[in-house]
């Protein structure tokens, strides 16, 4: 079992219950899923690019990604309906906790010129979205094996009712927010 999951059950959950005055443990906010999304617009011109993106995403998430396709044709972007334009992975359960642990302890400290995560990236319902400019911050990616540096979106979906609860939950997991 992941260390962060144990930490949540033993310390974080009781602390949040006391802090927000919840009467039941089920009211305490928890992380429901983590979604990783990588847009690969260059895949329209070169099919190999999508294979490399899928390989990188599989290594990072530990789970096979789903290829996302264009919903409608856009002449300006030279894409047609049904063209592969990205990939995404939804992590839940054990893999989610392991990914969160790697993200907080290893990947975020490796971001260049890092000054803390923005607190403005909450959506109003306690969910947090962040962008990563380089996939090489993850230890699973070998620098000499990548074809191109790609970024990705990471969305942490919580059961929190508002941003204050969501932020308290993520801060309890040592998420480095800007002061």
Swiss-Prot record:
GO CC annotation terms, alphabetical: ribonucleoprotein complex; ribosome
Molecular-function GO term, any one: rRNA binding
Protein keywords: Ribonucleoprotein, Ribosomal protein, RNA-binding, rRNA-binding, tRNA-binding
Keyword match tRNA-binding: yes
Keyword flag Protein biosynthesis: no
GO biological-process terms attached to the record: translation
Domain of life: Bacteria
Signal sequence segment: none
Known partners and oligomeric status: Part of the 50S ribosomal subunit; part of the 5S rRNA/L5/L18/L25 subcomplex. Contacts the 5S rRNA and the P site tRNA. Forms a bridge to the 30S subunit in the 70S ribosome.
Function statement: This is one of the proteins that bind and probably mediate the attachment of the 5S RNA into the large ribosomal subunit, where it forms part of the central protuberance. In the 70S ribosome it contacts protein S13 of the 30S subunit (bridge B1b), connecting the 2 subunits; this bridge is implicated in subunit movement. Contacts the P site tRNA; the 5S rRNA and some of its associated proteins might help stabilize positioning of ribosome-bound tRNAs.
Sequence similarity: Belongs to the universal ribosomal protein uL5 family.
Name used for this protein in its record: Large ribosomal subunit protein uL5
Taxonomic lineage of the native organism: Bacteria, Pseudomonadati, Pseudomonadota, Gammaproteobacteria, Alteromonadales
């Amino acid at each position: 079992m992941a260390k962060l999951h144990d930490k949540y059950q033993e310390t974080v959950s009781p602390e949040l219950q006391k802090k927000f005055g919840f009467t039941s443990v089920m009211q305490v906010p928890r992380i429901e899923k983590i979604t990783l999304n990588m847009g690969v617009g260059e895949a329209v011109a070169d099919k190999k690019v999508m294979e490399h993106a899928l390989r990188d995403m599989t290594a990072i998430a530990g789970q096979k990604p789903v290829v996302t396709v264009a919903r409608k044709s856009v002449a300006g972007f030279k894409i047609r309906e049904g063209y592969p334009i990205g990939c995404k992975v939804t992590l839940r359960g054990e893999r989610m906790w392991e990914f969160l642990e790697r993200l907080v302890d290893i990947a975020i400290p490796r971001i260049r010129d890092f000054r803390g995560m923005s607190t403005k990236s909450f959506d109003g319902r306690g969910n947090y979205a962040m962008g990563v400019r380089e996939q090489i911050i993850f230890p699973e990616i070998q620098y000499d094996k990548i074809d191109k540096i790609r970024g990705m979106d990471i969305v942490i979906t919580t059961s929190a009712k508002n941003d204050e609860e969501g932020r308290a939950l993520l801060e309890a997991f040592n998420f480095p927010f800007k002061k």
